[in-house]
Every structure is written in structure tokens, then in C-alpha cells.
Amino acid sequence: MRLSFGKQRYHGGTTVTLTEQGASDSLRAAQAIFQNHSNEVSSPCPPVTVSRNPQTRLSEPSLQKSGRKQEQKKARIRTKQVPKIKTTAPNDVELSKKHRSSPAGKDNVSSTAQMAAALAHSQSKLSSDNNSSHSSALDTLKVLETPNLNGLLGIHSRSSSRNGSNESLTPGQRTPDNRSQENLLTSFSSGRRLSSSSMEPATNKDSNKALPKRRPSPPLQSSLVGSGQLHENENLSSISIDSRHSLNPDTSDVISNRSQTSLSQTINQLSLCESEPSIASSNTTTTTSNQGSGLPNLVPNYSSDMRKKKLVNKFKRKVFGSKPKHLSSQYEMDASSEELGQHEQQPSMRFKTTLRKTSVSTNAENDHASSLHEGNLRYKYNPSNDTYDVYDDTDSDSESDQNQDALTKPRKRDRIKRKIRNSANKTAHHRPIHRTRDRKFNEDKPWKSHTDITFVTDNERKRYESMWVSNRHRHLNLLSWWPSITGDSGAINTLPEDGLILGIIVRDIWKRSNLPNSLLAEIYTKVDTRKDGTLDRKSFIVGMWLVDQCLYGRKLPNVVEQCVWDSVDRYASTTVVPVSTLKAMAKQKRKQMKEEIKNIKKENRVVLVDHNSSS
């Protein structure tokens, strides 16, 4: 009778059909595996079997007699070439003729497949009685199903689902062993697909009646199992399947024993997980919080938000200066964890000590000083006494500090600068003795730009002449002696060429100096040479110069010197002696006069002594 096997692969919850080359390779691997199991008649059937065709049944003695030695040799040779591919073999699928074995070994391939199928069917029938006792234990495991159960039994359930052949059987042909394996499969698939209602039809009524009603799993169960854990389970399941179906006949018993011990260890771990629900709940909350926001913030002092706050506060200190003293409080604001969503004020532990070591210290101070090297302390600058306050910072992992910029220890350079700025003696800045720039003329204080000289300078003469030109020949007809238009014009010919200025206009100009009228009248009498109520050019310029000298603070001289009158019509080429030089010269003159007086007194004294001695 001819058997046809269609090779498929179970991956990611779906069954994928293999290629022709992969199907031929997997068929060879299955033949070698069944040949190894046929040699072990006394050993129990492995928990994972391939699909069986009930139509091909041969007796066990006939299978053992037909070419056992030849198949063992062929299996040993094929183990080096067969890849480890996990397959299933449903019925009614035939492989293509291109990838089948050679014509010489065609009969061997078909006979080996028939032998393997018959052997698997017979051994499953014999082990059904033994596995009925284990089905009750597996049913109780399903009652105790928890989120931790899915993670613990995921390896066994996936290995049985990927290598088992229950998918090719009908619900009536499934054994209790297969049902127990399906219970484990549904416990794991319920965590991944969030429902297990579509896994088993209503044919298993007897087994469902024996099971008590259990509490449904939470809907967020799948989120507790990370993607990394699922990949690990897949890798472990593939490793266990490959090791379980290894082609070495000497290690088959050891592998079967390991599978039984792993199941017992799983049951023990399940009991431990059920006895400690509080620990499991706390672990689930931490995993969900970490899964939603990535890695946990193990060092909150160096998070991105705190670095931004630190830079902002540093910029504010540079622009607005340091914080005032009344803003530094004795207690700090501490934020609680984000899980509770509450903000509380807790007084943090703070020690009012400095980094200066004293000769006499208590045990508490020694412990506090030793903790400086452990890195559990923070520093805060105290501007009142130019020190750094130290306080404990053991709870920095769970609390976020708002004033992080003030809690870090300043650099050595900043501390030295602060000490120099506070301790250095500030010297007052003195103005230089020598004049660094030219002073401008101050109209409100004209005496500050005046030098004591005895003649009219060129700048002063130009300023006075401009006023003379703008005010001469005005209102002269008001004078009594000024000739009329119809009168004699002989008097006009005797007037000076530069012209004249009316005395009333001169008085109005000089009054702007705010000098007293008596002083102005005295100046006018000293410069008036015409005695007819008018002033000529020389008299007006000299009078203006005397007014300025009075404004500079000099006393009005009794008689105007001739050098002043001469400087009006000439350009003075003499150098101006500075005031300091004039003062030094005057001091030297006084000193010489004192020396002269002393010498005169000595001579008089000598004369008196000689006169007395002679007498």
C-alpha cells in the first residue's frame, strides 16, 4: 500500500507548507527517527509523534524481522546529512517525483514509512492506558492556570504543538494523551491570542465535565509576556525538540527522563507562583510600566528634563544674578512616584555642617565625614558665611529634585574665584594727576577753562569782534550831537573808520553776565575814552575782556595795563606759561625773599655786637 505525506511546518501560529526539497529532507529525518524508536521496544513512546494512518497496520514482530541491520546502517549514514526540520505529515498529499529517492532505494523508502507508521500507531495504543492516569494530573494543571503558568509551560506546549500530529486526526480519534497536550496548548495560546474558545470543539464533553469552572484570564495577559520571552520560548522549544528527536539511540531514554523531570519542575514552580500572588502582582506592575515607557529612569538626577532645568537655571543666574537669601528654605519639595500620581512635601535630611575639619569631632561627625567619600552627600552654597552646606542624598534614586543646579558641588575654579572676590581688599580708584584729555569750555563754569594771563588772546579777540560787528552803527541817531540829514555833515567826517557802538546797547550786552550794575559801571568808566556815550572798537573789546576776567574770579584792576590795549591790535606771539609753573615761580620768589630777610637780620646782629664790643 502506498503512503503519501505532505510536509508542513508550524511557525508563528500558522502552518506553512514546505518546499519539495525540504519535504524530502524532512521525510528522511522522520524515517531515521522512527527507525531508532523501532529498536527500543521496551521504552515508552515519546510524547511527540507524527501523524498515523489507521489503514496501514502491521504486526510488531514482522517489523522487527524485516531488514533491521540494514536499516540501522543506513540510518547512521543518513544522520550526518539530515537537517533538523520540524514537520508534520498529514494525509492525502503526495510529494513530487523529482525529489524522491533513487529507483534503487524506492522500495526501502516505502517500506520504512509503512513500518514507522504502524509502529507509532501500535505504541500509541499501548501507551494510552498508561497515559490515562496522567490526564487527571494535567487537567488539574489547567484548573490552576495563571499568567505565570503560560510562561512556565510554554516550552512544553509549543513543542507538542509543533511536532505533534493531532491536527491530522479527527476529534473521535484523539486519545486522552492528545487531549492533555491540547489543554497545555490552549493554556499558552490563550495568552497570545487573548481567547481559547476556538481551540477545542464541543466533542470533549466528558473531559469538560470533570474540569471545575475556572476564573477567566485577564485581557491584558498577553502584554505581560514580552516579545523577548516568546522568542526565548521558541528557541528553547526548538532546542528541546531537536534534542528529543536526536538520532543517537543511546540517549533516547535519558531525554525522555529529562522531559518528565522538566514537567515535575514546572509543577513545583507553578505551586510557588500560586503561593506568592503579591510578588507576582508587583512584578507585573513594574513590567507594564517599564514596557510602556522603555527603560526605567534609574538615575533621575541626570535625565533630560533635569539637564534642561539645569541649563535654564544656569542662564537665569548669569542674567538675573544669584537667588536672594530669603528664597532658600529649610525644607525641600520632594515629588512622590508617578504610579500614585500625588505630590507631597517631605522634609529631607540636611546637616548644617561645612567641609572644614575640626580638631575635636564626635562619632557622628566622623561617620558623616566618611560618607563624603561614598558619594551619598550633596553640597549647597551658603552665601551668608561663604561655605557649602552638606546634606544626605540617599533617596535621590526615587525622588526628583527641583533645584538640581544648586545641589551639585561647584568646580574648584569657581570656588577659588568666589573666595578671591569676597576676601580681596578693594582699593579705591584715584584719578590720574596728569590731564588725559582736553576739557571742553563750560558756559556755566567758564572760570575752569581760564588761565591767568595779562593780555587778550586771539580766540577771545575774535569772539569779541563778532559781537562788535553785529551791533555797531545801530541807533546812533538817538544821540543829541548826531547830525541830522538836513544839517551839517562835518561831524560825520570826524568819526573813526571802524565805527561806534551806542552805550545803551553795551549795557544790555554786559547785563547778560549777571554781574552787579555797580561793577559794570566801573568797567565802563575805565574803558570809555570818548566821553560822548559811545565806545570805539578797542574800548569795547577791552571792556568785554574785563567782564570775563570778573566772571573768572579775578579782581578788577585799578588801571588797565598798556599791554592789554596793545594786544587788541596785535597778534600776541608769546607762549602761555601754565598756572602750575607760575605758582612754582612765585613760591621760589617767596623763598628767596625769606633768605634775604634772614641775611639782613644776621648782618644787623653782627653790627650791633661789634658796636657794643667797641664801646
Swiss-Prot record:
Protein name: Increased rDNA silencing protein 4
Biased composition (Acidic residues): 389-402
Biased composition (Low complexity): 121-135, 157-168, 184-198, 281-290
Physiological role: With TAX4, acts as a positive regulator of INP51 activity and phosphatidylinositol 4,5-bisphosphate turnover. Negatively regulates signaling through the cell integrity pathway, including the MAP kinase SLT2. Also seems to be involved in rDNA silencing.
Compositional bias (Basic residues): 409-438
GO biological process, one term: fungal-type cell wall organization
Family per record: Belongs to the IRS4 family.
Region (Disordered): 38-135, 152-260, 277-304, 323-445
SMART domains: EH
Cellular component terms per the entry's GO annotation: cytoplasm; mitochondrion; phagophore assembly site; plasma membrane
Ranges of Polar residues composition bias in the record: 50-65, 248-260
Lineage: Eukaryota, Fungi, Dikarya, Ascomycota, Saccharomycotina
Residues annotated as domain EH: 460-571
Gene it is expressed from: IRS4
Domain of life: Eukaryota
Database matches in Pfam families: EH (PF12763)
Subunit structure: Interacts with INP51.
Bias-annotated ranges (Basic and acidic residues): 365-377
Gene3D superfamilies: EF-hand
UniProt xrefs under InterPro entries: EF-hand-dom_pair (IPR011992), EH_dom (IPR000261)
Signal peptide: none
Keywords on record: Lipid metabolism, Phosphoprotein
Sites of Phosphoserine modification: 180
